[in-house]
A protein has these predicted regions:
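Short acidic/glycine-rich loops and adjacent helix/strand connectors
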Residues: 1-296
Length: 296
């Protein structure tokens, strides 16, 4: 049995091929088009995977994508009413995901009607959990997925045992540890997609002097909020405008619009411009950001 995994229309677009239970290849599109964090459809990565496996498109039995457009539909519809522009952008992504069979056929100059594969849409965070647990050496494990946003959730947790996963809870948009980290990264003068690692490294050179404020930015009390955390939304704008993101073009690095509000500057001081020098204050804020993340 040949299974093709496709991560498309998201940062780090990639593909993987599993043949008879063995991972043959897994690679990101950026390795071929030389675009950092390339999004779009990973046609070159898919071509490489099939070549490495010595098979053709006709030999693929199953295709899995880490996105379920129908997950949390009620929440999506609610935000569509509140944020029409955001809804239109997400609708464009939905159209692309439903067109993956056509994009796959086009990558091989084939007719979509010739595809014999069965397509599977896997909820975003369940795909994260599965990709970690099912290749681990553990028979049982606690599972956690936390990122910016996927299928309108930012965090999911549960347990794994044998070949099964049990989902115990999730945190829905707009509350997100990933968007929290990205927002403060932007505030500290690092606006590009994927810049968070710079701030994580910077944290080692500072002291968490603003931890009290960061505990208001991300609120977590296991006694009063047993099902997760909450963002202090006054510090953010994504819940009002939707996170502006570009994922469609494989020839470009993804972009993310502004996430933090004026309240963050009011409470923490003026936001740093990208060209401004790094001061000890910025290092201390980075340390506070990281410390609060680790607390939660």
């Amino acid at each position: 049995m040949n299974i093709l995994g496709i991560n498309a229309y998201h940062g780090n677009a990639s593909a993987a091929i599993v043949c008879d239970g063995k991972l043959i290849a897994a690679v990101e599109e950026e390795r071929f088009n030389r675009v950092k964090y390339a999004a779009g459809f990973p046609a070159l990565a898919i071509q490489y995977c099939l070549k490495a496996a010595g098979i053709t498109l006709a030999d693929i039995d199953h295709v899995a994508v880490p996105r379920d457009p129908y997950a949390r539909m009620a929440t999506k519809l609610l935000y569509a009413l509140k944020m029409p522009s955001f809804a239109r952008e997400r609708a464009k992504v939905l159209v692309k995901f439903t067109g993956i069979p056509e994009a796959l056929a086009a990558a091989f100059d084939s007719d979509p009607k010739n595809l014999k594969s069965q397509f599977h849409r896997v909820e975003h965070h369940q795909a994260h959990l599965a990709s970690a647990f099912f290749v681990s050496p553990f028979e049982q494990a606690a599972l956690l997925s936390a990122d910016g946003l996927g299928d309108f959730a930012s965090t999911m947790w549960g347990t794994g045992a044998g070949s099964q996963m049990k989902i115990d809870g999730a945190v829905a948009f707009p509350h997100s540890l990933g968007l929290y980290y990205s927002a403060v990264t932007q505030y500290l003068g690092f606006p590009k997609y994927g810049d968070e690692y710079k701030v994580m490294g910077l944290a080692a050179y500072g002291q968490p002097e603003s931890l009290d404020v960061f505990r208001q930015i991300v609120r977590f009390d296991p006694n009063s909020r047993p099902n997760g955390f909450e963002l202090g939304l006054d510090f953010f704008v994504h819940h009002r405008t939707g996170p502006e993101m570009s994922w469609a073009d494989a020839g470009k690095t993804p972009t993310v619009g502004k996430l933090f509000s004026d309240e963050m500057a009011r409470r923490l001081g003026q936001a740093r411009l990208p060209e401004a020098p790094l001061e000890q204050r910025h290092k201390n804020l980075s340390a506070s950001l990281q410390a609060r993340l680790e607390e939660v």
